[in-house]
Design a protein with these regions (language model features):
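N-terminal pre-first-transmembrane soluble regions of secretory-pathway and organelle membrane proteins
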Residues: 1-41, 195-205, 209, 213, ...
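Membrane-protein extramembrane domains
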Residues: 14-132
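Hydrophobic transmembrane alpha-helix bundles
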Residues: 72-80, 162-176
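Membrane-proximal, non-transmembrane alpha-helical segments
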Residues: 89-139, 154-166, 170, 181-200
Length: 239
């Protein structure tokens, strides 16, 4: 009995040279004919049968990798026909999925084995900050900010009427909620891209972004501590 399957994943990914080499080693062992395609941000496409040409790709800032495809066959045949195996590693910001693979023309036992192994490789590509790119995280962040705003206003406005308090909270929540809903996702996507290809010179690019991320968070917490200590000092001396 011959079967086939198609699976997709939508989590954030970090495609590193190490994980790509590991995946390629498995595919090259199981299949006899392997070919690669690399899609670039400017629209160009590269076709090769040598994985090293992808690993050594010198990608300038405006020509970053957006997708890598690996196609393979059990026996040599024309790749214009549907291959026995294909996997796409895509930039989630430009695609409806980050990983998609299809397996065809294999037995039931082979299908179970391949699905288990490719699922494992796919999870290896999942970024450590994948949760930060989920819609649920954005929603929770906005709600938390709105709760903090409501508490802050309640603390400052103990003497105003309930109606005035409710209308003030509602107006500020709507305005700030709208701003957060727009700015938070954009800021997080900038700091934590939905998909990255740490291959070639892009490795250094994302290392620099990681350092920038750390500096931003250190600066944020230092500013927060200074603000708290300043508030305590003002309250102490104003007594």
């Amino acid at each position: 009995m011959v079967g086939q399957i198609t699976k997709t994943f939508k989590f954030s990914t970090a495609v590193t040279s190490r994980d790509l080499i590991s995946l390629n080693k498995f595919i090259s062992t199981e299949f006899k004919q392997v070919r690669y395609k690399m899609y670039i941000m400017d629209g160009s496409i590269y076709d090769t049968d040598d994985i090293n040409q992808i690993l050594e790709y010198d990608n300038p800032p405006l020509r970053k990798i957006t997708k890598i495809e690996i196609n393979a066959n059990k026996v040599a045949k024309d790749f214009y026909l549907l291959p026995d195996f294909e996997i796409s590693l895509s930039d989630l910001s430009k695609s409806s999925y980050s990983i998609k693979y299809e397996i065809r023309n294999v037995t039931n036992k082979e299908l179970d084995y391949y699905v288990k192994k490719i699922d494992e490789f796919s999870l290896n590509f999942k970024s450590s900050y994948s949760i930060l790119n989920s819609p649920q995280f954005f929603s929770i962040t906005v709600v938390i900010f709105l709760i903090i705003i409501a508490i802050f206003i309640a603390f400052l406005s103990k003497k105003i009427s309930l109606n005035h308090y409710v209308s003030t909270v509602a107006a500020l929540s709507a305005a700030i909620g709208f701003v957060l809903a727009k700015l938070v996702p954009s800021f997080l996507y900038w700091l934590y891209p939905q998909s990255i290809f740490c291959i070639g010179k892009q490795e250094q690019y994302y290392e620099n972004k990681k350092k920038l991320r750390n500096n931003i968070f250190v600066g944020f917490f230092l500013a927060l501590m200074v603000g708290i200590l300043g508030s305590v000092a003002v309250n102490y001396f104003m007594k």
